[in-house]
């Protein structure tokens, strides 16, 4: 029997069409437990489409994506996902703290609807790590783009998922917080499998052990790639 001991995701012959536009063309790849996959490529090259297909949020025109836990194929995995563009309605009256806490929806609450002390401490620690604890009671419609991005990143990672999928996590983040986000990502990589899309690879590429360029097809590089290219570094 074929062994999938280290494999956690298998992308098999994926093609995605939107009408007459081919976003992904016969993409094949594998992700192993503990990998840090850094993905770059030109705008419109299919990077976000690949992530959504890997997450089973988008059905491919052809091919399939399979998940594994050890030797067993499984229906799902525990993902933390930060999309490039959030589908959160900024007009919805939800606070920063409530958004971060929504990443713990599977946690048990007491009869009053409150989280356990341990969960509450995790919410507090996550908000501090993201630098959003100072405006925890602000509704999201009042946030800057960077503040909202850090809030959503907190929601994505608070449950300590097996796989963290980050689509342009530095979007809208003020320069003062960029190094902080890099530190958070490096910390995540110590305990989770990470898949990260970014146009800025100078730091991210050094963290990663796998490097992909997606331009409708997928190119797996043998060395780090530090700049936006359509070819791997030689």
Model-found features: residue ranges?
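Conserved ABC ATPase signature
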Residues: 139-143, 147
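Conserved ABC transporter NBD signature motif
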Residues: 63-79
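Helix-to-loop junction immediately C-terminal to a conserved catalytic motif
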Residues: 55
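The feature captures the beta-strand-to-loop junction immediately N-terminal to the Walker
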Residues: 40-42
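Conserved ABC ATPase "signature" region
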Residues: 116-135
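Catalytic Walker B motif of ABC-type/P-loop ATPase nucleotide-binding domains
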Residues: 164-168
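Conserved beta-strand-loop-alpha-helix hinge in the C-terminal portion
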Residues: 205-206, 213-234
């Amino acid at each position: 029997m074929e062994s999938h001991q280290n494999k956690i995701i298998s992308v098999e012959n994926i093609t995605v069409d939107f009408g007459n536009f081919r976003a992904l063309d016969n993409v094949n790849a594998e992700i192993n437990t503990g990998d840090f996959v850094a993905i770059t490529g030109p705008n419109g090259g299919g990077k976000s489409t690949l992530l959504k297909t890997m997450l089973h949020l988008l059905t491919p025109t052809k091919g399939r994506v399979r998940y594994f836990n050890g030797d067993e194929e499984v229906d799902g995995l525990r993902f933390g996902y930060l999309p490039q563009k959030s589908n959160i309605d900024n007009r919805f009256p939800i606070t920063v703290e409530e958004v971060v806490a929504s990443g713990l929806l599977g946690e048990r609450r007491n009869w009053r609807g409150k989280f356990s002390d341990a969960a509450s401490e995790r919410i507090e620690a996550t908000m501090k790590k993201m630098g959003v604890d100072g405006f925890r009671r602000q509704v999201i419609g009042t946030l800057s783009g960077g503040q909202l991005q850090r809030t959503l990143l907190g929601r994505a990672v608070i449950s300590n998922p097996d796989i963290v999928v980050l689509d342009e996590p530095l979007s809208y983040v003020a320069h003062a917080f960029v190094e902080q986000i890099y530190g958070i990502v490096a910390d995540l990589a110590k305990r989770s499998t990470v898949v990260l899309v970014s146009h800025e690879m100078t730091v991210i590429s050094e963290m990663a052990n796998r490097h992909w360029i997606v331009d409708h097809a997928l190119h797996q590089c043998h060395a780090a790639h530090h700049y936006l290219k359509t070819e791997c570094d030689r």
